[in-house]
Amino acid sequence: MCGMRILGLDPGVAILGYGVLDFFDSAPPVVCDYGIVQTSAKTAFEARLAAIYEDINSLFSAHKPDLVAIEKLFFYKMGNTISVAQARGVVLLCAAQHGVPYVEFSPPQVKLALTGDGRADKRAIQEAVQRELGLITMPKPDDAADALAIALTGWFHHLPPAAREAVPAYSVG
């Protein structure tokens, strides 16, 4: 039996990354599943949101997470930010319907937690995810790797402060 199962999510409308990790008291995290939910730009927006809902709802049903860790919105293009916010709303609706609490982290918070540098590049994050999860290769695509990084950050922030020092990636900096 696992101590905690975290569903990490990197929200998006075209591509939404997900990663499911199990955490035990003193053992390394275990990767249960990761991947992406993809929708086509040729599909009506409301149908894309419905597809995201169905796929994410299936993930909740299949994996029964104890916690959702999701990336906070990062403002860069107004139109894109609004559509990502709507996709996040769909994800948070699923979490609420399944009675699963959520935590959210900005991209710099995830980078800082995994590398000790809030401005780390994507490659450094992927290497940290690969190292912390004991993966032979870097997880692909990038959105799935980001979701695994968000799940790891969720676990780190769930730990009591004294326990954080024992986690190698998080004692950096």
From Swiss-Prot:
PANTHER family: CROSSOVER JUNCTION ENDODEOXYRIBONUCLEASE RUVC. It is found in: Cytoplasm. It is an enzyme of class 3 (hydrolase). GO terms for molecular function: crossover junction DNA endonuclease activity; DNA binding; magnesium ion binding. The active site is at D10, E71, D143. Keywords: Cytoplasm, DNA damage, DNA recombination, DNA repair, DNA-binding, Endonuclease, Hydrolase, Magnesium, Metal-binding, Nuclease. One of its GO terms (cellular component) is Holliday junction resolvase complex. It comes from Gloeobacter violaceus (strain ATCC 29082 / PCC 7421). This is Crossover junction endodeoxyribonuclease RuvC. Mg(2+) 1 binds at D10, D143. Mg(2+) 2 binds at E71. InterPro entries: RNaseH-like_sf, RNaseH_sf, X-over_junc_endoDNase_Mg_BS, X-over_junc_endoDNase_RuvC. The gene is ruvC. Binds 2 Mg(2+) ion per subunit.
